[in-house]
Amino acid sequence: MGKYFGTDGVRGVANSELTPELAFKLGRFGGYVLAHNGTEKPTVVVGRDTRISGVMLESALVAGLLSTGAEVMRLGVITTPGVAYLTREMNAQAGVMISASHNPVQDNGIKFFGADGFKLSDAQEAEIEALLDAEEDTLPRPVGVELGHTSDYFEGGHRYLSYLKSTIEGDLEGLKIALDGAHGSTYSLAPYLFGDLEADTVTIGCNPDGNNINDGVGSTHPEKLAELVLDTDSDFGLAFDGDGDRLIAVDEQGQIVDGDQIMFILAQDMDARGELKDHMVVSTVMSNLGFYKGLESLNIKSDKTKVGDRYVVEEMRRSSYNLGGEQSGHIVMMDHNTTGDGLLTGIHLASIVKRSGKTLSELAGQMTKYPQRLVNIKVSDKHAVEQNEHVAAVIKEVEDEMNGEGRVLVRPSGTEPLVRVMVEAKTDEDAERFVNKISDVVRAHMGL
């Protein structure tokens, strides 16, 4: 990570940290680095989520892009994977998404995609950061007819949905599915997609007002969706996050089905159909021990990366694997898209439920989860946790007590000023006790 770029683009409190001035510079410098590779009039597609700050930042970003001579196509409210897909499909030189994903409404972010639909490399981010920190802006300033134009392509969302439909066999007729759009990017796309596939749908989180994105709804708050599933006797529920790149499900009993379980279900189905490349799934170090044991029972291999879907994607690209993801619900199906895609994952999961004739609880129950506890602690310097001797000592103490029957992971968040403490153990009681023991030490020596 650099000075400006975190694990998922540039993020901050909108109009305070992520200002219109910075958005203009990101448009100008980012657009130049990505789009002006011998292309006289490069095309850049731009999408956003439903945050109140989105239009402000979009306007500034687009102005920066236009100042370099780029042609800009505004997609309006759309998902992050929708931007990635349309960047490739429309032969654009770059794509930009304005969103802070699952973060609260006051935050926003800007993430770039190259012409191939993949997020930026470290080298590209470093090049943009060097331009941001330069004493003088020496990039070309076209005038007159050489300036860029802007146009609206709000139909792009439905072009993306048409593609998603083509990735599954048949329809979803006979299923009743509860959908939670997080008052975000999927608020209209999800009901349209699943309805078009003949599913019976009920919804929450599909009435954005600019300020309610992720507010008690979506993939980080699936409790209301669980209630909706039970109240409406739905077959299962699907919860998306603010920008639609992750998915958490709820089974017919109201139990949460997380990214590990979804990956397990997809891997089992893909492997049985001969579609899982090298019988391999890529996950992060946060995936549950039960996930790995479940894959082993199916003779499916696994590979671990650092936390962050960008690292999952990097490993998948490096080794040509086609399924990977995170416990948080970022699931990457590389045969179909270049980034985590909640809608894509959702229709494939629904298709498996229909084809198998099993309930989602039966499918998810084939993987036994180890009790896991995760605590997020606000700190002034999140990276200092890696060198803190008090934290290191308590981790060793807990690991010695576990004696191999569990694991501990303490790490800085990639996007927020937090230290994340994760513990897995044989019992709920042990997991709770161990995570509290470590968290108390982190708070005492590092907390605000």
From Swiss-Prot:
<dbReference type="InterPro" id="IPR036900">
    <property type="entry name" value="A-D-PHexomutase_C_sf"/>
</dbReference>
<dbReference type="Pfam" id="PF02879">
    <property type="entry name" value="PGM_PMM_II"/>
</dbReference>
<protein>
    <recommendedName>
        <fullName>Phosphoglucosamine mutase</fullName>
        <ecNumber>5.4.2.10</ecNumber>
    </recommendedName>
</protein>
<keyword id="KW-0460">Magnesium</keyword>
<dbReference type="GO" id="GO:0005975">
    <property type="term" value="P:carbohydrate metabolic process"/>
</dbReference>
<feature type="active site" description="Phosphoserine intermediate">
    <location>
        <position position="101"/>
    </location>
</feature>
<feature type="binding site" description="via phosphate group">
    <location>
        <position position="101"/>
    </location>
    <ligand>
        <name>Mg(2+)</name>
    </ligand>
</feature>
<keyword id="KW-0597">Phosphoprotein</keyword>
<feature type="binding site">
    <location>
        <position position="243"/>
    </location>
    <ligand>
        <name>Mg(2+)</name>
    </ligand>
</feature>
<dbReference type="InterPro" id="IPR006352">
    <property type="entry name" value="GlmM_bact"/>
</dbReference>
<dbReference type="InterPro" id="IPR016055">
    <property type="entry name" value="A-D-PHexomutase_a/b/a-I/II/III"/>
</dbReference>
<dbReference type="Pfam" id="PF00408">
    <property type="entry name" value="PGM_PMM_IV"/>
</dbReference>
<feature type="binding site">
    <location>
        <position position="241"/>
    </location>
    <ligand>
        <name>Mg(2+)</name>
    </ligand>
</feature>
<dbReference type="GO" id="GO:0006048">
    <property type="term" value="P:UDP-N-acetylglucosamine biosynthetic process"/>
</dbReference>
<feature type="binding site">
    <location>
        <position position="245"/>
    </location>
    <ligand>
        <name>Mg(2+)</name>
    </ligand>
</feature>
<dbReference type="InterPro" id="IPR005843">
    <property type="entry name" value="A-D-PHexomutase_C"/>
</dbReference>
<dbReference type="GO" id="GO:0000287">
    <property type="term" value="F:magnesium ion binding"/>
</dbReference>
<dbReference type="InterPro" id="IPR050060">
    <property type="entry name" value="Phosphoglucosamine_mutase"/>
</dbReference>
<dbReference type="Pfam" id="PF02880">
    <property type="entry name" value="PGM_PMM_III"/>
</dbReference>
<comment type="similarity">
    <text>Belongs to the phosphohexose mutase family.</text>
</comment>
<dbReference type="InterPro" id="IPR005846">
    <property type="entry name" value="A-D-PHexomutase_a/b/a-III"/>
</dbReference>
<keyword id="KW-0479">Metal-binding</keyword>
<feature type="modified residue" description="Phosphoserine">
    <location>
        <position position="101"/>
    </location>
</feature>
<dbReference type="GO" id="GO:0008966">
    <property type="term" value="F:phosphoglucosamine mutase activity"/>
</dbReference>
<comment type="function">
    <text>Catalyzes the conversion of glucosamine-6-phosphate to glucosamine-1-phosphate.</text>
</comment>
<dbReference type="GO" id="GO:0009252">
    <property type="term" value="P:peptidoglycan biosynthetic process"/>
</dbReference>
<dbReference type="GO" id="GO:0005829">
    <property type="term" value="C:cytosol"/>
</dbReference>
<dbReference type="InterPro" id="IPR005841">
    <property type="entry name" value="Alpha-D-phosphohexomutase_SF"/>
</dbReference>
<dbReference type="InterPro" id="IPR016066">
    <property type="entry name" value="A-D-PHexomutase_CS"/>
</dbReference>
<dbReference type="InterPro" id="IPR005845">
    <property type="entry name" value="A-D-PHexomutase_a/b/a-II"/>
</dbReference>
<dbReference type="Pfam" id="PF02878">
    <property type="entry name" value="PGM_PMM_I"/>
</dbReference>
<dbReference type="GO" id="GO:0004615">
    <property type="term" value="F:phosphomannomutase activity"/>
</dbReference>
<keyword id="KW-0413">Isomerase</keyword>
<dbReference type="InterPro" id="IPR005844">
    <property type="entry name" value="A-D-PHexomutase_a/b/a-I"/>
</dbReference>
